[in-house]
Structures are given as structure tokens and as C-alpha cells.
């Protein structure tokens, strides 16, 4: 530790370092060693929930707990404290005549934030709070910095996101939200594993961005002297596994898109993609509904859920509507009759729909109408299907109307939660779509993809009819934790330095 760093320490930090050195002089490792505990705070509260003070005294049972010291009060020969572990807090009752002079000195000199282990009798105070009456204290780790003021929770947003460790210590609501996230992902895995899907891993570094309409992050591989991109989707590699005969696969992993940031977008996020051979988009629609309803039930229980004051009937069958019908219902404009691109553009101008240079087909205009007018109306879980071919380069054409694809998106509270389709398995058609995307890219569409010749070659070996799905894990977690910003469900969101 440099002298410069010591000079920057405040008074509290200096005192804590002095206490650290005093512990070492007493032969106590300031940063401790392994410690065996017999219970956590939640287990004790559950086990003894119905026991009175007198009944606990009669039982005379002991427990060994460990955690971070969050409060401490008292004077003379008696003190109280609260110890925090992963499940919550438990009160400590510490008497000098019960723990001995040396142990009581450890307690007296302990700072808030220190980790200690405590062995003692399970009791209930006169106020009715379940507590541990300590008989032995063990110092486990020294905190050299004071915790956030009064531990009532951080309120500075920058600190919450940059120093998530402090947020987790001081904000139980935040801590529980991330526990819910982990449980949600585990339940999705459990659901798919139960349907005989295999979890796999595919590369994060790609030679060509593909599988989604998004701008990639570019990096350089020094050893091979080639530029590479971080994946914007896992789709193309997973479909190569379907070609290889794996039949049912999924991957939960990080995706990287070099795009804007807002309440629902972070450049680095988590998605799940699922592929099932011999299935179509209708099968995947049912699968999607099952995944989301299973996850919701596991973390929220049966029934509808509340999201920002709106009751979401996530437990009921999801609505299903064709994109063209949804547009007609909201705007009165009917795109079912055949029309020229000029006629479609005229309709767009009439309705003041923003137009982009790469909107060169009726399909682009239909999609623009949907995004402009319909998305904001989709509050209850709704599957919108039948996207135009032009905006669905990896989806199979609908055999009854080849202007559209066998694709759907799931919308809840006006946001997209899933994207899925009957996968395009015709390599000739796939190459043609890739070429159209490459042309759109030249016209200024930054989200258009290039041509992945390796994937086209894989398709030429034959891929069975397949349904595929992508779900945004972070958005789903936002929904199930009643959160309005993606940063609150990412442990470490992207921040400026």
C-alpha cells in the first residue's frame, strides 16, 4: 500500500486499518478462514416461527450462524446486533458473562460491515424477536471501508449501478430481484430439460454477424490478423446443430449489439434461443407460452401478475393475431389486397409513417405501419404472426401467401418479448435472402446482415423442418420483478467510465 493511498484515507478508514492491525497482533487473522455454520437466518425463523420465548428456553437449542454485521448497539456488558446473510438478518444478543472477556472485546471492536461467526442459544427477546444468545464469537473478515450511510439503501443511481456490491448489501429489494432472476432462468432450464432439449454452447466470436438485424461490435484477432464480431445472436450456429442431428437444442447466453441504450436496451444482454426439429411456428408458439407461464408461476405463483399497476393475465391463453389484421384493426388500413410499393408508400405518407431509404417493398411499409401504430396497443400477452418476407430473412414463407412468413413475435406491455418462426431450410432461398440483406446494408441499413456462406453450405446438407425461438431474458425478468429499467435486472449494466 503506497503512502499516497494512505494519505487519501478518511478518518474512519484509518481507524479500521488500525483495528485490523490490532487483530493481527492478537494472533487473529483479520481476514479469517473457513467457518462451519449450522443454519442461516431464514432456516432459523422458519424452524422456530411458532415457538414462544418460554418454549425456546425449554428447548435450549443452539445454532451457529455467520454473516455481515449490519447494526450494533448497547453499552457496558450487554450488546445487540443484527447479522446479515444471504437469506436475511438475525438478531444477536451478546453478554460479556456469556462469551467471556476476549470474545466480548471482539464484539465491542467490531465495525459495521465486518463478518463474524456466532454460536449460541436460540431465544426470543421480550419484544418477541428471534435471536441468538451468543456463547462464542469468531472474527471472520475485516471491512476496511464503512458501509453506505445508515444502511437504509443506496439512493444514488450511479452508485447503485457502478457498485452493485454495495447495492446488494444495503437494498434487500434489489438483492431479492437478482435471486428471482436466477430462479427464473433455472426454471426455464428445468422446463426445457423436461422436454428433452439439450443445452449447448456456441461461439461468441463470429467471422460474420448474423441471425438478427443489429449492428455488431467489431474486434481483432491478433494471432490470425483478422477482424471478428461479437455475436448478435446464437441462431445460425444452433441451426447447424439441427443439421447435425441434435434435433432439440437451446442456449442461454450473452448477446452483444452495438446500438443505443434505453430503459429496455443494454449493449450486452442475455437471451435464450431454442430450436426444435420437425416443428413449425405454431408448435413454437405453444412452447413459448409454456416457457413463460412456467417461469411466471415458479417465481410469482398462480394467477395474473401486476406490472406497474396493470394486471397482466399471463396465466391465461395468449391472444394470437396476424400482423395485417392487427394493422387494419388499429388504423383501418388493409394490406391484404395486392398493391404496388408506390401505393404502399402513398398510404404511409397519408398516415405520416416515417420512411427509410431502404424501404423498397410493400413488406417494409407493412412492418413500419405495425411499429408505428400497433405495438403501443399490445398490453396483454399477444402473439403477432405473419411478418413480411422482407423483414424476416431467416423465416420460411407462408405457403398460402408467400408475401408473409410463418413467424411470430410475442408482445406484452407494448414490448417484444419473443421472436420465432418456422425456420427457412431451403439453402437457395436462404442465399437469396442474404443477398437482399447485403443490398439493404449497402443502401444504409446498419442492421442488415451480411452473407454467411458457411451457414448456407450447412443448409445444403439438409435441415429438417424446424421451429426456432428467441426470448429476451432481461425483459422477461423485468416483467416478473415489476421493474421499469433493464439496468435493475443486470448485475453490472454497461456504464460510461
From Swiss-Prot:
<feature type="binding site">
    <location>
        <position position="416"/>
    </location>
    <ligand>
        <name>Mg(2+) 2</name>
    </ligand>
</feature>
<protein>
    <recommendedName>
        <fullName>Lysine--tRNA ligase</fullName>
        <ecNumber>6.1.1.6</ecNumber>
    </recommendedName>
</protein>
<dbReference type="InterPro" id="IPR004365">
    <property type="entry name" value="NA-bd_OB_tRNA"/>
</dbReference>
<dbReference type="InterPro" id="IPR004364">
    <property type="entry name" value="Aa-tRNA-synt_II"/>
</dbReference>
<feature type="binding site">
    <location>
        <position position="416"/>
    </location>
    <ligand>
        <name>Mg(2+) 1</name>
    </ligand>
</feature>
<keyword id="KW-0067">ATP-binding</keyword>
<dbReference type="GO" id="GO:0005829">
    <property type="term" value="C:cytosol"/>
</dbReference>
<dbReference type="InterPro" id="IPR044136">
    <property type="entry name" value="Lys-tRNA-ligase_II_N"/>
</dbReference>
<dbReference type="GO" id="GO:0000287">
    <property type="term" value="F:magnesium ion binding"/>
</dbReference>
<dbReference type="GO" id="GO:0140096">
    <property type="term" value="F:catalytic activity, acting on a protein"/>
</dbReference>
<dbReference type="InterPro" id="IPR018149">
    <property type="entry name" value="Lys-tRNA-synth_II_C"/>
</dbReference>
<dbReference type="InterPro" id="IPR045864">
    <property type="entry name" value="aa-tRNA-synth_II/BPL/LPL"/>
</dbReference>
<dbReference type="GO" id="GO:0004824">
    <property type="term" value="F:lysine-tRNA ligase activity"/>
</dbReference>
<dbReference type="InterPro" id="IPR012340">
    <property type="entry name" value="NA-bd_OB-fold"/>
</dbReference>
<comment type="similarity">
    <text>Belongs to the class-II aminoacyl-tRNA synthetase family.</text>
</comment>
<feature type="binding site">
    <location>
        <position position="409"/>
    </location>
    <ligand>
        <name>Mg(2+) 1</name>
    </ligand>
</feature>
<dbReference type="GO" id="GO:0006430">
    <property type="term" value="P:lysyl-tRNA aminoacylation"/>
</dbReference>
<keyword id="KW-0648">Protein biosynthesis</keyword>
<dbReference type="InterPro" id="IPR006195">
    <property type="entry name" value="aa-tRNA-synth_II"/>
</dbReference>
<dbReference type="InterPro" id="IPR002313">
    <property type="entry name" value="Lys-tRNA-ligase_II"/>
</dbReference>
<keyword id="KW-0460">Magnesium</keyword>
<dbReference type="Pfam" id="PF01336">
    <property type="entry name" value="tRNA_anti-codon"/>
</dbReference>
<comment type="subunit">
    <text>Homodimer.</text>
</comment>
<keyword id="KW-0963">Cytoplasm</keyword>
<dbReference type="Pfam" id="PF00152">
    <property type="entry name" value="tRNA-synt_2"/>
</dbReference>
<dbReference type="GO" id="GO:0016740">
    <property type="term" value="F:transferase activity"/>
</dbReference>
<keyword id="KW-0030">Aminoacyl-tRNA synthetase</keyword>
<dbReference type="GO" id="GO:0005524">
    <property type="term" value="F:ATP binding"/>
</dbReference>
<dbReference type="GO" id="GO:0000049">
    <property type="term" value="F:tRNA binding"/>
</dbReference>
<keyword id="KW-0547">Nucleotide-binding</keyword>
<keyword id="KW-0479">Metal-binding</keyword>
<keyword id="KW-0436">Ligase</keyword>
